[in-house]
């Protein structure tokens, strides 16, 4: 739990240091929205220089996707930005509309040489979709096929530009 309010900066720094010593990649999932709460996931990212990968539910949008990305990208200008990925994409054509809606100035290279670009999208797929319920997702222990769903999601991610990034570089 990387909670700056509950645990304090020193504890969060120690947890990140420990995780970095034992892993090639650290993935931190924010709760609610990127800028929601005090401190927010954006506060955590900015405090520790953690690049933000915005995963945006694109299931019911096309051109608006670019506006959402632009807002996330520029709302706090000094926020480290890794790029954007679309979720719940309906088709290849939908994927192209989403990609085309993202403005060139919302992509590019960040200070420090991080390529902050279009990192692809995940199609709607029952093989890895998680059932939702009020106040959250179904927990893994309630899904007899949880590992198969996780494997399907990993395979889908591996086929995206995000999945092609060499974490050893």
What are the language-model segments listed below?
Residues 1-48, 56-80, 92-96, 104:
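ATP-dependent carboxylate-amine ligase catalytic core
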Residues 62-169:
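Internal gly/pro-rich beta-alpha loop/helix module
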Residues 53-56, 85:
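Short glycine-rich or small-residue beta-strand-to-loop segments that form or flank ligand, phosphate
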């Amino acid at each position: 739990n990387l909670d700056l309010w509950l645990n304090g900066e020193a504890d969060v720094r120690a947890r990140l240091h420990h995780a970095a010593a034992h892993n090639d990649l650290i993935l931190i999932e924010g709760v609610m929205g990127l800028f929601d709460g005090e401190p927010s996931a954006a506060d955590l990212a900015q405090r520790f220089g953690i690049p933000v990968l915005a995963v945006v539910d694109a299931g019911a949008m096309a051109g608006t996707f670019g506006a959402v990305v632009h807002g996330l990208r520029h709302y706090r200008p000094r926020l480290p930005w890794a790029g954007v990925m679309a979720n719940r994409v309906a088709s290849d054509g939908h994927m192209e509309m989403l990609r085309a809606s993202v403005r060139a100035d919302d992509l590019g290279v960040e200070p420090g040489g991080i390529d902050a670009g279009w990192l692809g999208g995940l199609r709607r797929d029952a093989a890895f979709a998680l059932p939702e319920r009020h106040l959250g997702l179904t927990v893994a222990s309630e899904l007899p096929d949880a590992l198969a769903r996780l494997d399907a999601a990993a395979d889908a991610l591996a086929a995206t530009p995000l999945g092609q990034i060499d974490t050893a570089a």
